[in-house]
Regions:
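Hydrophobic alpha-helical segments typical of transmembrane helices
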Residues: 1, 27, 47-48, 87, ...
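Conserved SAM-binding loop
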Residues: 13, 37, 62, 184, ...
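Short, flexible loop segments at the rims of nucleotide/cofactor-binding pockets, characterized by
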Residues: 14-18, 39-40, 80-81, 126, ...
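Active-site phosphate-binding/coordination module
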Residues: 21-119
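Hydrophobic residues within well-ordered alpha-helices
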Residues: 31, 66, 195, 221-222
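Short active-site oxyanion
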Residues: 34-37, 58-60, 147, 207-208, ...
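Conserved acidic, metal-coordinating active-site core of Asp-based
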Residues: 94, 98-101, 105-221
Length: 224
């Protein structure tokens, strides 16, 4: 019998207007009375929790950053993985030659080198604030980053994905969370591994879990 329900946000629960329908909200509310509800997103933790608070007035066990961060209401963040500083430096220096927008996430804060259309659009989509840091490469080279996100056309990102997988395959995972978003996260990170971590922490059985998702980054949860 299923008693744990895991929901992706963008493209799954959130509609084209980035809203959860009243019908879906009521279903999740009913589920949460007798079962466990988990949200699993590529979004920042603050962005995911904001959605939960907006529609449900509280937070739930949450997988953020495509598995790099795990949160539970009782304790806060219980998992926080990062791309190491030296790896982040190598990747950013490499992708900059392709003239693609890149952004980084440090301590659940969004950073961009430039205040451009891409970062403004992303911040609006995710309902988060951002900081412009012209020396962002220098910053990630010192402290690392939870993830790196590239934003460009689907075709350009498909090509970049192939290139990055060949060059950095042993140190990071590279996958798309949206046609125009290419995610770069620590090698040991994905939504499936984060779900396994949460399942073991909470004492849930694998056969009790059902997952809802729509994109490449959600496949790891189905495989788990």
């Amino acid at each position: 019998m299923y008693r744990v329900f895991v929901f992706d946000l963008d493209g799954t629960l959130l509609n084209d207007s980035l809203e959860i329908s009243e019908k879906d909200r009521k279903v999740i509310e009913r589920l949460s009375r007798n079962c466990h509800v988990v949200f699993a997103s590529g979004r920042m933790l603050v962005s995911t929790l904001n959605v939960e608070k907006k529609y449900f007035g509280r937070t739930f066990p949450t997988i953020a950053y495509n598995g790099a961060m795990v949160y539970i209401p009782e304790e806060g963040v219980i998992l926080n993985e990062k791309v190491p500083p030296e790896v982040a430096k190598d990747i950013v220096e490499y992708v900059k030659q392709f003239n693609v927008h890149w952004q980084a996430y440090i301590d659940d804060v969004l950073y961009s080198e430039k205040d451009n259309e891409e970062i403004r659009g992303y911040a609006k989509h995710s309902s988060v604030e951002y900081r412009v840091e012209p020396k962002l490469l220098e910053l990630v080279s010192k402290v690392g980053t939870t993830k790196i996100l590239l934003i460009d056309t689907p075709e350009k990102l498909d090509e970049l994905k192939k290139i990055l997988l060949e060059k950095f395959n042993n140190v990071v995972k590279v996958f798309k969370s949206f046609p125009t978003y290419l995610e770069i996260v620590p090698e040991n990170v994905d939504k499936g591994k984060a779900l396994r971590f949460l399942r073991e922490r909470m004492g849930w059985k694998k056969e009790e879990i059902v997952v809802f998702g729509d994109n490449e980054n959600d496949l790891f949860m189905f495989e788990e």
